[in-house]
Design a protein with these regions (language model features):
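C-terminal cap of metal-dependent C-N hydrolases
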Residues: 16, 387-441
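Alpha-helical scaffold segments that flank or form the walls of functional sites
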Residues: 66, 84-155, 180-196
Length: 441
């Protein structure tokens, strides 16, 4: 047996039964990239003998530190990263035309792509995002650079080359349907040839308005051929919904368009879902499609208030997304907070409404996201056998937004981090057992 690294102290994670489970005085053993035990620290002497653990492989957490699963961002636009925190003055469709498409068009320049993607992935890792579901741009070479960057940094990710040939600017659209399909398949094979357990391709029609019916059908066939994930947008704003109905008059809904062309699968991630009708929710549930809830973006672009309680009650898989740059923060901690506040806002307008709790939002940010991307057998919490994607958090680090007092309980320290903490409180980031960011060195 190889060397086992052991973390002792407080851990917090989510399970299907408990949205937030806090376990104190625990020992977590990691062999290579997987969790081999989660036991009371009182059993450590026995565990050391059983696993031949050397004292130098033990990391003892202080009373202000805890271990939590890595955060999962189920929806982010990597080429929009330069716009994060600016240009949020227009609603969705006008915002795309005026700010987003011009920025994404710049990624035809490989040097620009390399610089921006390096900054984006580094930022997300510092913010604790161990897994990200990335929209790239429509540029094949530029999106290969995104895949290479993620691979080199050690982040877990789904990476997609955007497909769009209709209803988009002439300076930023693919030449033809055949070119789009050819380059998408080339990109899929390129990512697969990285032979990485962490970086996977994801088929990415930008949205129904930008992809004619045959285009979406053939992208769905490509995904099936290569056993790929799929991602797109759905029911983000009312004006978008109306537009989809005009473009696809034969359909009964936005979700029906995707269902008809074969894009709704159990490996599909649909971003937003703000304006889903009941029959659309049922269709997503039947197909196993997950929803990326992006509350910051939905508020910033005035798209609407997504009723996450409704989606969860219907049995949908739901995770959180930053949707940079529609969302102004690249941190899933921000999405977690905004999700709670959005749900509380809905509760002020709906008698008897049960808003989601901070603990439930924590589960969305970790295990929920893992389920949306069909990786809950590998990541999302600290179950034995799963890969070790984790954050070492310290709520007492100097110069952070947190104030900790002697009477604070462990639960209160964790709540303070979730509501007020930031990347300065995250000391170490692990992906598949590898330390990819370390502030303790």
């Amino acid at each position: 047996m190889g060397d086992v690294k052991v973390f002792t102290g407080t851990i917090v994670h989510a399970t299907d039964l408990e949205p937030m489970q806090i376990l104190e005085n625990m020992a977590v053993g990691v062999l290579n990239n997987k969790i081999v035990f989660v036991e009371p620290a009182s059993e450590l002497a026995t565990l050391k003998t059983k696993y031949k653990i050397q004292d130098t492989r033990e990391i003892t957490m202080t009373q202000s530190q805890f271990l939590m699963p890595g955060l999962v961002d189920t929806h982010i636009h990597a080429p929009q990263f330069p716009n994060t925190g600016i240009h949020l003055v227009l609603p969705l469709l006008e915002w795309l035309d005026n700010y987003t498409f011009p920025t994404e068009a710049k990624f035809a320049d490989g040097k620009f792509a390399q610089y921006v993607y390096g900054a984006a992935v580094d930022r997300l890792l510092r913010c604790g995002t161990t897994t990200a579901t990335y929209f790239g741009s429509l540029h094949l070479e530029g999106t290969k650079i995104l895949g290479d960057t993620v691979h080199a940094r050690g982040q877990r990710a789904l990476v997609g080359k955007v497909n769009m040939i209709a209803n988009c600017p002439s300076y930023y659209q693919e030449a033809s349907l055949e070119d789009s399909l050819r380059e998408t398949e080339e990109f899929i094979l390129y990512i697969k040839n990285l032979k990485s357990d962490l970086v996977l391709p994801i088929v990415t029609p930008r949205s129904a308005p930008t992809c004619p019916k045959e285009h979406m059908e053939r992208l769905a066939q490509l995904a099936l051929k290569h056993d790929c994930h799929i991602q797109s947008h759905i029911c983000e704003s009312r004006s978008e919904n109306d537009w989809v109905q005009e473009l696809f008059p034969w359909s009964t809904s936005y979700a029906d368009v995707y269902g008809t062309v074969g894009l709704l699968t159990d490996k599909t991630v649909m971003a937003h879902g703000v304006w889903l009708k009941d029959e659309e929710v049922a269709l997503l549930k039947e197909s196993g499609t997950g929803v990326a809830h992006c509350p910051n973006s939905n508020l910033s672009l005035r798209s609407g208030l997504c009723d996450v309680r409704r989606l969860l009650s219907a049995g949908l898989k739901v995770g959180l997304g930053t949707d940079c740059s529609g969302g102004y923060s690249p941190s899933i901690l921000n999405s977690l907070r905004q999700a709670v506040l959005m749900s509380k806002t809905i509760s002020t307008m709906t008698e008897g409404y049960e808003s989601i709790t901070l603990q439930e939002a924590f589960r969305l940010a970790t295990l929920g996201g893992a389920k949306v991307i069909c990786m809950e057998d590998r990541i999302g919490n600290f179950e034995v056998g799963k890969e070790f994607d984790a954050l070492l958090v310290d709520v007492a680090t100097m110069g952070t937004p947190l104030d900790i007092f002697p009477e604070d309980t462990t639960e209160e320290k964790i709540e303070k981090f979730l509501y007020n903490g930031d990347d300065r409180n995250i000391l170490q980031v692990y992906v598949a057992g590898r330390n990819v960011m370390d502030k303790t060195r």
